[in-house]
UniProtKB/Swiss-Prot annotation:
It is an enzyme of class 2 (transferase). GO terms for molecular function: histone H4 acetyltransferase activity. The keyword Translocase does not apply. Component of the HAT-B complex composed of at least hat1 and hat2. The HAT-B complex binds to histone H4 tail. Residues 456-496 are annotated as: Disordered. The record marks W181 as: Interaction with histone H4 N-terminus. It is found in: Cytoplasm; Nucleus. Pfam families: Hat1_N (PF10394). The gene is hat1. It comes from the Eukaryota. Acetyl-CoA binds at F254, L255, I256, Q261, G262, T263, G264, H265, G266, V267. Keywords: Acyltransferase, Chromatin regulator, Cytoplasm, DNA damage, DNA repair, Nucleus, Transferase. It comes from Emericella nidulans (strain FGSC A4 / ATCC 38163 / CBS 112.46 / NRRL 194 / M139) (Aspergillus nidulans). This is Histone acetyltransferase type B catalytic subunit.
Amino acid sequence: MSAEGEWSCDANDAVQITIVHPDQQKPKTLSSFHPQFTYPIFGEEERIFGYKGLIIRLRFAAHNLRPHVHVSYDEKFTAVDDAEPVDIIGALKEFLPEEAFSSLPEFESAVQEEDAKEFVPPGKLSHSYSIRGRNYEIWAASLADPQVQLLLNRFQIMVSFYIEAGTPLSTDDPEWTLDRWTVYFVLTAARYEKVEPPTPTASSYSIVGYATTYRWWFYKRDRSENPMPRDGPFPPPELVRPGELPSRLRIAQFLILPPHQGTGHGVNLYNTIHKTCLDDPTIMELTVEDPNESFDVLRDSADYHILRPEFLKHNIQINPDPWSDFSKKTKRVPTSSLLPLKTLNEIRTAYKIEPTQFAHIQEMFLLGQIPLKNRRKGGANMARLLVKKYRDDDPNNRRYYWWRMLTKQRLYKRSRDVLIQLKMSERHKALEDTVTNVEDGYEQLFGFFNEREERLRAQQEEAETSNNRDQRTKRKFTVEDEDDEDESAAAKRPKA
């Protein structure tokens, strides 16, 4: 057992991912980092047996993502019976194209000598933005494009490294299927910056991250019509393209590389995808396929800042006196009197956000509209709330009571099959505890949103300062040029 531990190492530590670009003599490292997961490649325990001092260097050219694998180690275990070293190259071949296993000199020569200066990402430019004085672009292209397939096949191992339970896409499907997919590449765009490239052939682009989306057919029945069967041929003689059918757009993969995380690239990428939905009349909703916790936070932040102005514009808030619309009080939560449901549905449809996510953001916004002193975090008297309920004199206390009731109603509908198996007292306690946890989560998000607002405000001020500085510099150069011309003309004039 001790010998096995001596010859075993952590696969996440052994793999080193490096992004490189050309330099004067040989490729230069732009960034280096380790994977978060390696179990799809090296097994559930994420350990590699059979080597001492193992380093698996996985390099990618910054612009076209050409990969290269280089394995080095101090010692290799000699096979004994069934105990033999892990076949590292064999394991990686399932996740990388054949060109990744060329010799190191061949890879370095390709990076150095390849004329990458004219490289332009495939597809069309969807969005450009600046962060901390650097320029970035987001390009979108169909997966049916051969150049997109080339880039994706080179870089798809990142799905296994960073997206838990993620599956690389198949690029061998029929063209009509591939055409349902869109790939978004996020890249630095140094061609706009006043810096000299490291070599005359170097590209101005460098990978930051990417996302993939696909169209999912949306069945939208017009209930005013009575559907009738047709006797026409099947399949129909005219070509039906997926891009022309009503669809949901689903985000399948979404990745910002570790060196670029936490700086706003994810929000820019998500907002670009969302804008694509708004601009396409055939897309009905934007959905996400199995999001993880970190993506949920990003999505909540983006959607909250998209919807909040609309909620404020329409004065969306909880009606503290819903019973005024009823001749007598009912045992049910009067949702239709508490909220302007028609207006909310119109906002949701206009912004193409799927119902569950919209209800989540709406719930968060309604909590934020209640003053902090009337919420649990601000010291609200919860015992008094349980006694007074909707009869409290303070309308904000009544709003807070109804907010908790609306949230309990949503939670009960979602988990009804589990809750009905509990005793009534246990059911009430479970709902009360869950509402408290939901509220705590929203309060944490409010803090995150405030930090984001401050960061965006600082970035905007920095961009404005940079623009003003550039304008002052241009004006200064113009004045100096005019002065030089005046001095030159004066020097040619005869002296008195």
